[in-house]
């Protein structure tokens, strides 16, 4: 029988608490700690007041390729990559620190959760590590962005340099959407009358 280390268990509980606080799903907790599923569910209920959400983890790389998600994913992954290269941290600790940096840059806006959830950020790291995704440089701005693996060199233009038409529409409506929406409705009423 293998004896469990009390110190390791305490570290795992602390890590699980931090991950749960940041919004990690149960599958991520099971993968990153040595705690049993039952203990993780108990801990999750204690911290969140409800059982962990059920369902599969995101498994498609396509989510990271759409324009807005790509910008957020790239911002997170560049922070993660910097932390690894600088030797400040590794593994799940680097994911947590990079995610906290991402949250600082994309603060919670009136109850709307951040576009990139912690579990999705963790999945992104796994996709890059497995060679399904990579960082590629933009031909226009020189920034590095998440792309499908084996993206041909010098062929990528990011969605900041070349935004899709729907991005421009969203930007026009976003500054004061309540005010703009009422103005648009007023214009439509004037045209109809």
UniProtKB/Swiss-Prot annotation:
Location within or outside the cell? Cytoplasm
- Which cofactors is this protein said to need? Zn(2+)
Task: Give the domain of life.
Answer: Bacteria
Query: What is one cellular component GO term in this UniProt entry?
Result: cytoplasm
Q: Which UniProt keywords apply?
A: Activator, Bacterial flagellum biogenesis, Cytoplasm, DNA-binding, Metal-binding, Transcription, Transcription regulation, Zinc
Q: Name one GO molecular function term.
A: DNA binding
Give the primary localization class.
cytoplasm
Q: Write out the residues that bind Zn(2+).
A: 138, 141, 158, 161
InterPro entries for the chain: FlhC
* Keyword ATP-binding on entry: no
Look up the record and give one Gene Ontology term from the biological process aspect. positive regulation of DNA-templated transcription
Question: How, per the record, is the cofactor bound?
Answer: Binds 1 zinc ion per subunit.
Any one Pfam family match given in the protein's UniProt record, by short name: FlhC
Whether Transcription counts among this entry's keywords is yes
Sequence similarity: Belongs to the FlhC family.
Q: What is the role of this chain?
A: Functions in complex with FlhD as a master transcriptional regulator that regulates transcription of several flagellar and non-flagellar operons by binding to their promoter region. Activates expression of class 2 flagellar genes, including fliA, which is a flagellum-specific sigma factor that turns on the class 3 genes. Also regulates genes whose products function in a variety of physiological pathways.
What is the protein's quaternary organization? Heterohexamer composed of two FlhC and four FlhD subunits. Each FlhC binds a FlhD dimer, forming a heterotrimer, and a hexamer assembles by dimerization of two heterotrimers.
Q: What is this protein called?
A: Flagellar transcriptional regulator FlhC
**What gene name is listed for this protein?**
flhC
